[in-house]
């Protein structure tokens, strides 16, 4: 991209975190919680210039006096007014850019409803007046960021998990599987099992503490039963965690019991198959000729795949399910928390991509439905 051109903006809107930055960069400039907070009681902070809503980190830091809402549930936008606030915050407060001066690439969940893609397109062109726009499927971007065009992506974030097989750069829609089980459910489950230990976490603010415990101390056991026995016999896996008020709590087998739900959703009362079985099921829905390439390129992506031990466990479980001679390879890049964003940054800066954008002119001529003809 020559210096005369403006950098495109890449925004990966996740259920839990929004990642935003400039195409061509190797990491997002801004990463903040996808939350909008509103004061619980009007006028509680008289004279502090109280706003009627707060977004992202500011909402997080004032969470004690706010009611927090996530406009993206299970990867899908469910509250457009709040979503618009998040985008506004992204452009003006985080990136400090004028959206009417930059092309914008947004990401979407696999199998995002058509009406949602249209609504995103409409808001970008009509509310923010962007000059050009494109929307890409998250898992496909993750695969690009790993330097592949064929593989199967297990993308697990805060609100939803998808298994997406991709061949030569195109996702295979008939074999995409979704599990409504992700980071937020791990956090909820950890809250539940910690309360069984006598620790009480119930408010939205306390939930954030538990999320931190999860991110710092949880891991996936290679052999769950064996790990449970070890935990019962020794205190080797116990860790202590200091709460904001100074109280120190001890966490033992909860460290691996919470993430185990990814492999056995039944512990959460869910009927779904685990991430291992779902990955296998997705591969089996694909043509027999592409399966070998999928088994050899299982790419993990998203924050909920960051648990230590998850790749090894996945390798073990898939190998057990696959035909005995099959080579199974799990790719878990260290930057996988942001691989969707990184893939978007790569895509939006390719010279070949520049003719793919939906321009403002095309939008004005065709309306929001143009997104189905140009973005796939």
Swiss-Prot record:
Enzyme class: hydrolase
Catalytic activity from the UniProt record: ATP + H2O = ADP + phosphate + H(+)
A GO term for molecular function: ATP binding
Record key words, sorted: ATP-binding, Cytoplasm, Cytoskeleton, Hydrolase, Nucleotide-binding
EC number: 3.6.4.-
InterPro entries reported for this sequence: Actin, Actin/actin-like_CS, Actin_CS, ATPase_NBD
Any one Gene Ontology cellular component term annotated for this protein: cytoplasm
Record keyword Lipoprotein present: no
SUPFAM superfamilies reported in the protein's UniProt record: Actin-like ATPase domain (SSF53067)
Cysteine-cysteine disulfides: none
CDD domains with a match to the protein in the record: ASKHA_NBD_actin
Cellular compartments annotated: Cytoplasm, Cytoskeleton
Pfam family, one: Actin
Record family assignment: Belongs to the actin family.
Described purpose of this protein according to its UniProt entry: Actins are highly conserved proteins that are involved in various types of cell motility and are ubiquitously expressed in all eukaryotic cells.
PANTHER family cross-referenced by the UniProt entry: ACTIN
Name this polypeptide is given: Actin
